[in-house]
Amino acid sequence: MTRLAVLPPLAGGLMGLAAILGALLLLGLAVWAWRDRQFESTASVADAYDRWTDDQLLERLWGDHVHLGHYGSPPQSVDFRRAKVDFVHELARWSGLADLPPGSTVLDVGCGIGGSARILARDYGLQVLGISISPGQIRRARALTPADLNCRFAVMDALALDLPDASFDAVWSVEAGPHMPDKQRYADELLRVLKPGGRLAVADWNRRDPAVKPLNRLERWVMHQLLVQWAHPEFASIPGFRRNLEQSPYARTADSQPEGTPWLVDTADWSRETLPSWIDSIVEGLRRPGAVLGLGPQAVLMGLRETPTLLLMHWGFATGMMQFGVFRGRKSA
C-alpha cells in the first residue's frame, strides 16, 4: 500500500476526532453558560465541593491537593503534582511554620481532602486539625489519612469555628478566602483561635486593588464569571485582606500592645510562581486520559465544563487583574 493510499483514511480519522472533541467542547461551553454555581450561602459552597469530591475527577487529575502549585522563581518546568507539594513546603518555610517545634498544633482552615495537613503532620511533625464546610471532603480526607498520622478532620464553618480562643500554635489557610462572604469575620476567626506568639499562614486568590486601578468593561465580565462559576461571593485585594487582619480585635493580646498599635502582616504576590497551574490543570486531562475516561461520559463533560473558567483564571492572573496573595504574621505574645 502506498503512502498516498494511507493518508486519506488517516486524515479522515483525525478530522473525525477533531469534530468529536469540538462537539464535546461546545457541549461543555453550553453547560458552563447555562448552569453556573453562584454563591448563595455556605450551603452552596459545601454542595459544590461535595460534588467535586464525589465525582473523583479532581482527585484523579490533581491528586490530593486541591490548590495551585509553586513552580519556582522564575517558574521552572515542574510536574503539576510535584508543584503542588512544593507549594506546601514553600508556604511553610515562608510563613515560619517550618520552624515550629514538633508537636505544635495547627488548624488548617479549608483543608480540602487533607493533602496539606498530611504533609505538615508527616514532614514537620505537627498536630493538625483540618476543617472544611464540605462533608464529602472531610470523609475523603479521613479515608486518605493513615491512622498513625497526627491528623484529624472535622466539618466546620470557617466563619463560626467551634473552637476555643487561643487554642492553636499556627493557623494555615490556602485558597479558602474567596468563598467567605464576610472577609473581616474570616480574618477575626483565624486570629481568634491563634495562640499568643502563634504563626499565621494564608494564601488566596485576590483581585487587583480597585483603588490602584478599577476594572475595565472586559475585566468586569471576566470577574463576574470567576465569581459565579465557582461559588465565590467576592475576592479581597491583597491590601484589603491585610487590613482585615491588622485591624482585627484578635490581632493583639491585652498585655502585649497598647490600643492602636498595629499588628503587622507581611504579604507577597506569588502570581508568577503559581501561574502555570491553570494551564497544567487542563493539560493534566490530556496527560492522564484514562483518569477521565474511566469515570464515564459525565466526567468528560464536567472536565470540559471547567475548562473555560480555568482559562479565564489564567487570563486574570496573567494580566494582573487577579493576584495570588500570601500573608504571614506572628501574633503578639
List each language-model region with its residue ranges.
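N-terminal auxiliary segments of SAM/dcSAM-dependent transferases
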Residues: 7-59
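A short acidic, Gly/Pro-enriched loop at the edge of an enzyme's catalytic core
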Residues: 159-170
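A short glycine-rich, Lys/Arg-flanked "PGG" loop and its adjoining helix->strand segment in the class I
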Residues: 184-199
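Acidic carboxylate diad motif detector
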Residues: 202-204
